[in-house]
Amino acid sequence: MTPPSTRRLSIGIAFVLVTLSACEKAFVPVCKPVSERTGEAGCWITSDATIGQLPSQPIFWHIDSYPSRAEAEPAKGPRGTVVESLGKVWLLTIEIAGWRPAGGDRVAEIGPLPVTPGLSYAAQYMEAIFTPGMTAPAHRHPGSEAWYTLTGETCLETPDGKMVGRAGGAHVIVPGGPPMHLTATGTEIRRALVLILHDSTKPPTTAAPDWTPKGLCRN
């Protein structure tokens, strides 16, 4: 028979482990740095950029491609970031509507993005490659998320319903705050550039264990 003191110690250890596990889960990143890449499929962080305060005009995500990094870097403005992703060199810029860099090929202008005047922002850029059926766990962002989909289809469920982003279709922009659950749908591999434009004082992504999706993206 186990002595009461031993049982109490075991229960206490178990409680601490569960508490630690819950705390760790709340800050588990959905995406990993590209330096930790172990395969093609997944979500990989290509850059974390400081943006600072934004103009009071409507703000957009500008996407331009260049033949090489050497050509993209001189065109980069104060809110621009050059990344190599999905086999191309991209200049990704947070700016007002109608902004254009020197050279390159204009790919997309996504927005307007929901922003808060006076807030200091950071931009996390990612490369997402999901096979059909792959999901990202429930999570939330302290700022807007947007995708530029090159191939495939993605369904995103939030408490307000679902939205679908497809290559060649309307761009997906999700305001910060609400929890979300992402599923790669359709029959093609999803390849996308992803932006999280977030409050620079907060982590870009946190888990959302307090919310359970209804499975709307399975229908």
Q: What label would you give each PLM region?
A:
Residues 129-131, 141-156:
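Short, conserved beta-strand element in jelly-roll/cupin
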Residues 2-11:
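Bacterial N-terminal signal peptides that target proteins for export
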Residues 135-141, 158, 183-184:
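Short histidine-centered beta-strand/loop micro-motifs
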Residues 120-125, 190:
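Extracytoplasmic
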Residues 23-120, 209-219:
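A short, N-terminal "cap"/entry segment at the start of jelly-roll beta-barrel domains
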Residues 64-71, 159-179:
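Short acidic-glycine-tyrosine-enriched beta hairpin
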Residues 84-89, 175-203:
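Ligand-binding loop in jelly-roll beta-barrel domains
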Residues 10-21:
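Bacterial N-terminal signal peptides
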